[in-house]
UniProtKB/Swiss-Prot annotation:
This is Probable GTP-binding protein EngB. It comes from Staphylococcus carnosus (strain TM300). Mg(2+) binds at residues 39, 61. GO terms for cellular component: cytosol. Keywords: Cell cycle, Cell division, GTP-binding, Magnesium, Metal-binding, Nucleotide-binding, Septation. Belongs to the TRAFAC class TrmE-Era-EngA-EngB-Septin-like GTPase superfamily. EngB GTPase family. The lineage of its organism: Bacteria, Bacillati, Bacillota, Bacilli, Bacillales. GO terms for biological process: division septum assembly.
Length: 195
């Protein structure tokens, strides 16, 4: 699958189902802990520096951001989970908004869950994975920041993530570096299989 970086657009930042765009395209949700690098991942996958706004401040994405990817699919950037500095009320609102989208959106075909390869999955990562599996959603795990660990340790770290999540047979895990774009084509091919 090839994507034209000049044909990417942010359609809407939505908080309610009635704001979701009706494009007829299938959707790929991107979920992950705050500061796991979702925006950086999106920018690197589509070959655009600042399409998805990146921030040093975790918890910046507070809406569902729908990106039209070259009229081939929609990326939906979901607010990061596990960020302690937002109020309990805000966390509950995010939770409801995300749950509504994930459980009711027919166009959603796969959830790409990003996990920092350097660390074991957090309790929030495990809860998110279990939640997605409860609703029978296919999950593609992307272990981000591969360039931050020694090459010889990648497989060990991937195995740790698999074991901690109790990754189901049909779900795939791929390591990725937004710095080198290593495995970018493998990820596009994996996403395409779900559409």
């Amino acid at each position: 699958m090839k994507v034209n970086p000049n044909n990417i657009e942010l359609l809407i930042s939505a908080v309610k189902p009635e704001q979701y765009p009706e494009t007829g395209l299938e959707e790929v949700a991107l979920a992950g802990r705050s500061n796991v690098g979702k925006s950086t991942f999106i920018n690197s996958m589509i070959g655009r520096k600042n399409m998805a706004r990146t921030s040093q401040q975790p918890g910046k994405t507070q809406t569902l951001n729908f990106y039209n990817i070259d009229d081939q699919m929609i990326f939906v950037d979901v607010p990061g989970y596990g960020y302690a500095k937002v109020s309990k009320k805000q966390r509950e609102q995010f939770g409801k908004m995300i749950e509504k989208y994930i459980t009711q959106r027919e166009q959603l075909k796969v959830v790409v869950q990003l996990i920092d390869i350097r660390h074991n999955p957090t309790e929030d990562d495990v809860l998110m994975y279990d939640f997605l599996k409860y609703y029978d959603l296919p999950v593609l795990i992307i272990a981000t920041k591969e360039d931050k660990i020694a090459k010889g340790k990648v497989q060990k770290h991937l195995k740790n993530i698999k074991d901690k999540l109790e990754l189901e047979e049909e779900d795939t895990i791929i390591s990725y570096s937004s710095v080198t774009n290593k495995n970018q084509q493998v990820i596009w091919d994996a996403i395409e299989r779900y559409l």
